[in-house]
A protein has these predicted regions:
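Short glycine-enriched loops at secondary-structure junctions
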Residues: 93-98, 118-121, 147
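Short helix-loop-beta junction
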Residues: 105-114
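Acidic/His-rich structured neighborhood in mature extracellular/periplasmic domains
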Residues: 97-100, 109
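Conserved functional hotspot residues or short segments at active or partner-binding sites
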Residues: 144
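Divalent-metal-activated hydrolytic enzyme cores
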Residues: 22-84, 110, 119-137, 154-241
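Gram-negative bacterial Sec-dependent N-terminal signal peptides
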Residues: 1-22
């Protein structure tokens, strides 16, 4: 069997596991109001606008930063989502162990799609994943989530070269070049690193729009929003762009 055939079968199976927004008879879904902490259903997902999705994430981060996360029945969540998932948002984040999107936004099983790579950048694989999440699975928000003290950003600031990491860090060079913070342009200048981190998030948001006509089209139609954010590893709070 060809690679193309295998990929087509995999995508078909993936799509079946996450139905699009139609009822059991193929008709439109009647939206149902979102309830904080409840397991998402097809009908609830249909009611979550891009602005509402952003509001949910902001509220979740506020709970996390205040050390007041929701109490959830995780086993019940697993059982409730076993046959399908209806996430309301997608997050492109860094692999950093301190910045797990589900944790910093106080979300649970079945709530968000998460794509993670050092430096929260994108490539064709991640763009394809985001397109699936929004176009097929009904997610209404795309978040590019950077974080303070990012090792990948620091590596780019210092022009680190090491194996496959070299080509990854090269993706952050445009942000390094665009930064204008006074002083040395290396990882010892914390203000410079913070500026590069912010610029990288904004540039990735823009590249998503430029490199994915599907996501750009959905955003132009008001069906999704693409936003940037930075998680502060010192206080647990997320700033939005």
């Amino acid at each position: 069997m060809s690679t193309k055939s295998i990929l087509a079968m995999a995508l078909a199976t993936f799509a079946i596991s996450t139905p699009v927004l139609a009822d059991d008879h193929g008709g439109p879904v009647t939206p149902k109001p979102y309830t904080t902490g409840a397991t998402l259903t097809k009908a609830v997902q249909a009611s979550i606008t891009p602005d509402k999705a952003l509001e949910i994430l902001k509220a979740g981060n506020a709970r996390f930063a205040a050390d007041k996360p929701l109490k959830r029945n995780l086993k019940g969540r697993v059982q409730a989502t076993a046959l399908g998932q209806f996430p309301f948002a997608s997050v492109v984040g860094c692999i950093d162990s301190r910045a797990a999107p589900e944790v910093v936004f106080d979300q649970s099983v079945g709530d968000i799609f998460a794509a993670r790579v050092a430096g929260n950048t994108i490539n064709e694989d991640i763009l394809g994943s985001l397109e699936y999440a929004s176009k097929v699975a009904g997610s209404s928000l795309v978040v590019v989530l950077g974080h303070t003290g990012c090792g990948a950003i620091k590596g780019a600031c210092d022009d680190v070269q090491m194996g496959n990491l070299t080509s990854l860090l090269a993706k952050f060079k445009p942000a390094v070049a665009a930064a204008s913070t006074p002083g040395e342009h290396n990882s010892h200048n914390h203000a410079f690193v913070n500026e590069v981190t912010e610029l990288n998030v904004k540039q990735v948001v823009q590249r998503i729009r430029e490199q994915s006509p599907i996501l750009k089209g959905l955003e132009d139609e008001g069906k999704i929003k693409i936003v940037g954010a930075i998680y502060n590893t010192s206080n647990g709070k997320v700033s939005w762009y």
